[in-house]
C-alpha cells in the first residue's frame, strides 16, 4: 500500500489574496490545511531605526507609510507619544479635528477591508462600491493636507492647518462632460465641513447597500460562518485587539476603556461579536463604520460653532504662521531652528496607544534629551494577528485560508515595519 504523505504549497508572496507580500507555507493533507507558516519581512524598511536618525518632525512622515491604509491613525499615536514626553497640551479644536480624521481613516480602512475580503471570496461589487465612497474620503484628506494618502497632517502640538473654507471642484475635460462634472460638484459648493456633513448623511444608505449585497447572502455566509473561529479566552491569550478581539466577544476598545483626545465627550457604541468567526468580524467592522459616522457627525457639529487655534503657540515646538514669519525676525529664527535642528525632548520615555482600525497601535518612545528619538518601538496590531494564522487555518480548506486572511485585515507596511 502506498504511503500517504502531506505536501507543501507556497501561497504568495505574489498571490493577489495575500494582501501584500505575505508568503504562506501551507502543509496540506489533500486540500485540508494541517499547518500554515507565515514568512514575513519582505517589506522590512527599518522604520524604527530610521526614526533614530531623524528629528521628531522628520520622523513623522514615516508613520504614514506603516499601515498605508490607516495613515492619520499612525500619526496620531506618534504625536501622542511625543506630546506625552513634552508635557504638551493640545488645543481643543485640534483634538476634535484629529478625532474626526481618525474616524474618517477608520472608514477608509474598513471599507477596503470589507471590500477586499469580499473580492477575495468572489463578490466583486462590494469592492467597487467601497472605492466609490473612499474617493470622497480621500478628497477630505486632500483638502487638508494636499495628499490623498501620506498626509503628514497631524503634528506634535496639533494639526498642520485649520479646515479649509472651500472644496476643490472638478473641471470638464475630454473624458468628462459639463453635465457629469456638475453632478460631481453638487456637494462641493461649501466648506470642507459642509462636504463632510453631506457625506455623513449619505453614508448610512451606502452601508445599507453593503448589507443587502453581503450580510444575508447565502454564499457569503457559507464562506465566512464558522471559519477561523477564535474563542474569547484564546483571543486574549493570543494578544488580539480591535475588531479581532471584539469579534470574539470581548468588549475592549481603548476609545472607551482608556479614552484619549476627546473620545470621552462623544456618544458611540462598541459592537461585539459572539462566535469569533470571519462573519462576526465582518459584522463588527460594518457596525464600527456606522459608529464612526456618528462620531464624525458630532465632530462636525462641534467644529462649526467653536473656532480657535489648531496647534500650540509654543514656537519651539510648532512653526509660526507664514505672515508673522515674514515680518518678524524672532519668528523667522524660530522657523529656521525648527526645520534645521528640530526641537529637543526632555530625557525620559513614553508609551502612547490608540484604537487603530486594526487594533491596538502603540508607540514606545525613549528620549535621551536630544532632538532625535533614542529609541522608537512600534507595536503593530496586524503583526500579532498574523501570528495566529496557523492556528486559525488548521483543519480548513485552502479557499478558507483566503477568507481568514481577509478577516485578519493585514497590511505589510506595519507587519514588517
UniProtKB/Swiss-Prot annotation:
EC number: 7.1.1.-
Topology relative to the membrane: Peripheral membrane protein
Keywords annotated in UniProt: Cell inner membrane, Cell membrane, Membrane, NAD, Quinone, Translocase, Transport, Ubiquinone
GO terms assigned for molecular function: NAD binding; NADH:ubiquinone reductase (non-electrogenic) activity; quinone binding
Compartment(s) of residence: Cell inner membrane
Reaction equations catalysed: a quinone + NADH + 5 H(+)(in) = a quinol + NAD(+) + 4 H(+)(out)
Annotated Gene3D superfamilies: Cytochrome-c3 Hydrogenase, chain B
GO cellular component: plasma membrane
Domain of life, per lineage: Bacteria
Family membership: Belongs to the complex I 49 kDa subunit family.
Summary of subunit composition and partner proteins: NDH-1 is composed of 14 different subunits. Subunits NuoB, C, D, E, F, and G constitute the peripheral sector of the complex.
Listed name of the protein: NADH-quinone oxidoreductase subunit D
Species this protein is from: Albidiferax ferrireducens (strain ATCC BAA-621 / DSM 15236 / T118) (Rhodoferax ferrireducens)
Name of the encoding gene: nuoD
Amino acid at each position: 500500500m502506498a504511503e500517504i504523505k502531506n505536501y507543501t504549497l507556497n501561497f504568495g508572496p505574489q498571490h493577489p489574496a495575500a494582501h501584500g507580500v505575505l508568503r504562506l507555507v501551507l502543509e496540506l493533507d489533500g486540500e485540508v490545511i494541517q499547518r500554515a507558516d507565515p514568512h514575513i519581512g519582505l517589506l522590512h524598511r527599518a522604520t524604527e531605526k530610521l526614526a533614530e536618525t531623524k528629528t521628531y518632525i522628520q520622523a513623522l512622515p514615516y508613520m504614514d507609510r506603516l499601515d498605508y491604509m490607516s495613515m492619520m491613525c499612525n500619526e496620531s499615536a506618534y504625536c501622542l507619544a511625543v506630546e506625552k514626553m513634552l508635557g504638551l497640551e493640545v488645543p481643543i479644536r485640534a483634538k476634535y479635528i484629529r478625532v474626526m480624521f481618525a474616524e474618517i481613516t477608520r472608514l477608509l480602512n474598513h471599507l477596503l477591508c470589507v471590500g477586499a475580503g469580499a473580492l477575495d471570496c468572489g463578490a466583486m461589487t462590494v469592492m467597487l462600491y467601497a472605492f466609490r465612497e473612499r474617493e470622497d474620503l480621500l478628497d477630505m484628506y486632500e483638502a487638508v493636507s494636499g495628499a490623498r494618502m501620506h498626509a503628514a497632517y497631524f503634528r506634535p502640538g496639533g494639526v498642520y492647518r485649520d479646515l479649509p473654507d472651500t472644496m476643490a471642484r472638478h473641471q470638464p475635460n475630454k473624458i468628462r462632460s459639463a453635465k457629469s462634472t456638475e453632478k460631481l460638484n453638487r456637494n462641493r459648493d461649501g466648506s470642507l465641513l459642509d462636504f463632510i456633513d453631506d457625506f455623513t448623511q449619505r453614508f448610512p444608505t451606502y452601508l445599507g447597500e453593503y448589507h443587502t449585497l453581503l450580510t444575508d447572502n447565502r454564499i457569503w455566509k457559507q464562506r465566512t460562518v464558522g471559519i477561523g473561529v477564535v474563542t474569547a479566552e484564546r483571543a486574549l491569550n493570543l494578544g488580539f485587539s480591535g475588531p479581532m478581539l471584539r469579534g470574539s466577544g470581548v468588549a475592549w476598545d481603548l476609545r472607551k476603556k482608556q479614552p484619549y483626545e476627546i473620545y470621552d465627550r462623544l456618544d458611540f457604541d462598541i459592537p461585539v461579536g459572539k462566535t469569533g468567526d470571519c462573519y462576526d468580524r465582518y459584522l463588527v467592522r460594518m457596525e464600527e463604520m456606522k459608529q464612526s459616522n456618528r462620531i464624525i457627525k458630532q465632530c462636525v457639529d462641534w467644529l462649526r460653532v467653536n473656532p480657535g487655534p489648531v496647534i500650540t503657540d509654543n514656537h519651539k515646538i510648532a512653526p509660526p504662521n507664514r505672515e508673522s514669519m515674514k515680518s518678524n525676525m524672532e519668528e523667522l529664527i524660530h522657523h529656521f531652528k525648527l526645520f534645521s535642528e528640530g526641537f529637543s525632548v526632555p530625557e525620559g520615555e513614553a508609551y502612547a496607544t490608540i484604537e487603530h482600525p486594526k487594533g491596538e497601535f502603540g508607540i514606545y518612545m525613549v528620549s535621551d534629551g536630544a532632538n532625535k528619538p533614542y529609541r522608537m518601538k512600534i507595536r503593530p496590531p496586524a503583526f500579532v494577528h498574523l501570528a495566529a494564522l496557523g492556528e486559525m487555518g488548521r483543519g480548513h480548506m485552502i479557499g478558507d485560508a483566503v477568507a481568514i486572511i481577509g478577516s485578519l485585515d493585514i497590511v505589510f507596511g506595519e507587519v514588517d515595519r
